[in-house]
Curated annotation (Swiss-Prot):
Function in brief: Mating ciliate pheromones (or gamones) are diffusible extracellular communication signals that distinguish different intraspecific classes of cells commonly referred to as 'mating types'. They prepare the latter for conjugation by changing their cell surface properties.
Keyword Cell membrane: no
Protein name: Mating pheromone Er-20
Subcellular location: Secreted
InterPro entries assigned to the protein according to its UniProt record, in alphabetical order: Pheromone_protoz, Pheromone_protoz_sf
Length: 37
């Protein structure tokens, strides 16, 4: 799903779309560029 894609691709657009979801909190933040790091 879109959150899996965000984790896999570390896409800022996808991070925005699934920001504040648990998978982004745990798996994307810290891997993506600001403001999602």
């Amino acid at each position: 799903d879109i959150c899996d894609d965000a984790v896999a691709q570390c896409s800022m657009t996808l991070c925005q779309l699934c920001y504040n979801t648990e998978i982004c909190e745990l798996s994307v933040i810290g891997s993506c560029q600001p403001p999602f790091s």
